[in-house]
Amino acid sequence: SDVAGYDLLEPLADLDYVKSQGINGPIFALIALDSHDYEIPKAVAGKTQTTREALIDAILAAQLSDGGWNVNGNGADADMTAMAIQALAPYYSSNAKVKSAVDDALKRLSKMQEVNGGYTSWGTANAESVAQVIVALTSLGIDPASDGRFIKNGYSTLDALATFYNDKGGFKHSQSDTTSSNGLATEQAYYALASWYRLKAGKTSLYDMSDVTTMSKIIEKTVVNGGDSAKDPKKDTLASGSSLAASGTTRSITKKATIKLGKMTEAAKAALD
């Protein structure tokens, strides 16, 4: 709510403004608000108040008869269908309408999956579409490496994503991409891998930041050690797997987590390293 003095939540209070861009608006507004259970600010006079219910209703209303979503409303698109699932995932277990919509969307994504485990959007098989599906599945607790609905001819979405990886540490947009790495593809591929890692490590989903310790809480828990830290170390536990080590004004936060990787291509493993 305070980024260089700017309240990022304030524009999201105006429902009409949020919806003006299209279905992307309600989807990512809901994701943003739910990322840390933010309270929606009061809309200014004359504006339509945003509520979580209104955002959910807008997303559900845009679902197509084939079970998916698309920006232009003409047939399910893998990216938009996956993004809609990501936004609705927190309500899957508590809202019957959401559950029904998401179940239909999962069926559509399963049918849309290519024989190599990948996805095509706007006529092109690409890394970003695969990445969005991975994030959608993990947001529901579905392991894309093992769920049979999303494995075609032995290939999972993770296998498909790995085919876009290059030896420079990045990802290309499509197989015909002549650039060494594509910025958007690399960004989305890595946060998709992060979402899978978080699932395997038993952590919250990618956009669920309820496990984040805010700086104010860290400061409140800080233990200032005025003695010899080598002889008299002090630690203040912040959360499971995290510790705040204090020695005078030097402090560090360390987090460690390990997962056992399932069967996947070497390229996908390398991308996680």
Where are these predicted regions, by residue range?
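An alpha-helical repeat/solenoid feature that recognizes helix-turn-helix modules
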Residues: 1-3, 17-48, 52, 57, ...
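Eukaryotic RNA-binding helical-repeat scaffolds
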Residues: 8-17
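Extracellular cell-wall/glycan-interacting regions and their flexible linkers
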Residues: 100, 158, 270-271
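Extended intrinsically disordered, low-complexity coil regions enriched in Ser, Thr, Gly, Ala
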Residues: 152-156
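Acidic helix/loop microenvironments that form the catalytic cleft of cell-wall polysaccharide enzymes
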Residues: 159-166
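Terminal, non-catalytic domain-edge segments
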Residues: 160, 177-239, 245
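Solvent-exposed, low-complexity, repeat-rich "mucin-like" stalks and linkers
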Residues: 223-272
